[in-house]
Amino acid sequence: MNYFPNGDEEISLIKFIAKFQYLSVNDTKYFFSTQKYYRKRITSLVQKKYLRRTKSTLVLDELGIEYCKLFNFEYTPLNRNQKYFPRLLYISNLGAYFHNSKTTQFTPSFAMKDKEMFTITARKFIGVLDINGIEYLTYHISSEHTNKYILSVIYDIQKERKYKNIIVLIDDLNRINKQDFAFGNNQVLVIEDSEENREKLKYLNSVNWSRIIEKHYRNKAYIAEYNFCDYTDYKSKYISYFYFLDTEKINRIKYFLRENKNKNADIICTLKIKKEIQKELPTAHYIIVDLEDYIDKERIVYD
């Protein structure tokens, strides 16, 4: 028997678990280019004592810990506190999903270098998503979280000083009042947590908005100097675009319209996002665009 991990994929899996502590067996699929034999490969790593299976979760075993320390892999000691287990498993799931992404990297809260240990346990953020070099402090609100927890997320964002771009992944958008999530930051993206939206997140900063503007406004709109819109003709057009629901941008547009009763806003978005934004901005003029046509996507295929 070969007692070392077989190839880069198995090494990558071990490195991930060393950093994230836990990994659901179902999420191991994100680490292998072919799905045909990956469960056998997991079983082999368990037999070799690199990994240990606890119910449906994988953690490092004795040899796995030794291996990671030998090669100086980033290693996080296992947190056995059951109170934090659902949070840690969600963080691991998110990290595994973006593991192979060329545009998006996820750093868990406990691996953030700029946060003290007290901050990690006291604060509610789960980590940072880096999308094309832009960092987003990230939160998660699950179906199980109470209204008290939602309030604690709001307070947590209010006291954040470093990060001005925020992502809130939420199981059910109806759980929150969108107006409660405007803090004066650059962006607060409130996103329903689904596989479709996670895939879209990879291309958050990859949309060719200027091409969309050119198509619909024929070179008669320019990048705006205002904070309440993205483009304008400096006459009567105030144009904002939405890839996801941005509560900060909505709040700025609302304020502009409230102070300028004779003006309106043009909003460029998908039909799906329009249904949410229209609840907040019912009088805006909507231009519906299939944003897929304006994104160059990375190609990662799982068999």
What are these language model-derived features?
Residues 84-164, 168-172:
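Exposed, interaction-prone assembly regions rather than primary DNA-binding/catalytic cores
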